[in-house]
Each structure stands twice: as structure tokens, then as C-alpha cells.
Regions:
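FIC/Doc superfamily catalytic core
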Residues: 1-124
Length: 124
């Protein structure tokens, strides 16, 4: 099922989330010269498209890999990914597990196979 998963997440909100994470950890909040503009473009273009859930999660991972900020890219996009899926009706244990998979996938600590399995489990 495709929908506009990112429609309520303008780039300014992404920047604000990263700023908050950096402030909390006393880290520099600053855009990178190489990754900021490409990530912003990717994100903003995806916001207005209907995407599968997998595609929306992949946008977060791709933006993380572009490293638009000096610090906490993974945390920023993983937090958004985990929040995106809160509206999916799941039993508490399954919801917790799926949020974990989404966050770890976006952060790059697990791969496509694990995400695919978690998405298949949603359909059961």
C-alpha cells in the first residue's frame, strides 16, 4: 500500500530534530558541505510522492548515508522512521520489535534481509 508517509515531515523538522539531538549531547549542529543539499533534495522530493513503507524507510537510510549533518544523522532519521510507523496497529511486542528493526535499518546496523522479514511479518 502506497501513501505519502513523509508528507508531515518537512526538511525544517528534520533539521530541528538533529539540532535537538546535538544540543542534548553538546555536539556541533551544522550542515555538511557535501551531504546537506543532496539529502534535503531527496527528502523533499520524497515528501510529496506516494511510497510503499519500505521506500519511505529507505529514504531515511539514504539520507542518513548522505550525512547531511556533522553529527547524529542515524539518530535523526531513525527517530523519524520509528515515529512514522506509530500509526500501524500492532500488538505491543510486535510494535516494539518493528520499531527496533526500522531504526536499526535506517542507521545501517541491519540489512535488507532483516527489513524484508519484518515487513513480511507485518502482513501476517
Amino acid at each position: 500500500m502506497k501513501q505519502r508517509w513523509l508528507k508531515d515531515w518537512p526538511w525544517e523538522t528534520v533539521v530541528a530534530i538533529n539540532a535537538g539531538l546535538c544540543k542534548e549531547k553538546n555536539a556541533l549542529h551544522k550542515p555538511t558541505t557535501d551531504g546537506y543539499k543532496p539529502a534535503q533534495k531527496l527528502w523533499e522530493e520524497a515528501r510529496f510522492r506516494e511510497l510503499t513503507l519500505r521506500e519511505a524507510i529507505q529514504v531515511g537510510r539514504r539520507c542518513h548515508k548522505l550525512s547531511p549533518f556533522c553529527f547524529y544523522n542515524g539518530n535523526t532519521f531513525a527517530a523519524i522512521g520509528r515515529t512514522l510507523i506509530q500509526g500501524i496497529k500492532l500488538p505491543p511486542a510486535k510494535a516494539h520489535s518493528f520499531r527496533s528493526v526500522v531504526g536499526h535499518y535506517i542507521a545501517g546496523t541491519i540489512g535488507d534481509d532483516e527489513l524484508d522479514q519484518a515487513l513480511r511479518d507485518l502482513e501476517q
